[in-house]
């Protein structure tokens, strides 16, 4: 069985990625938090660089990016390059 390595993006890029993903999906921080199973303050802390997502949260974020197709892939490449 092959295990997938979690996506690793450092701050501040991960906060920018999360904010841009959330805005692309048209969700508020509270709505986006619900899709990831976290609280609104958690999303706020991620976006503002005060904390970073857990590996499990990053897996969920990566899944959302892939589900978006080209826009999500483009966003992923944009922040992986930084």
Label the model's feature ranges.
Residues 4, 55-74:
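DNA major-groove recognition helix of helix-turn-helix/homeodomain DNA-binding modules
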Residues 79-82:
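Helix-turn-helix/homeodomain-like alpha-helical modules used for DNA recognition
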Residues 26-44:
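Short alpha-helical DNA-recognition segment
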Residues 2-24, 62:
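A short, Lys/Arg-rich alpha-helix, primarily the initiator
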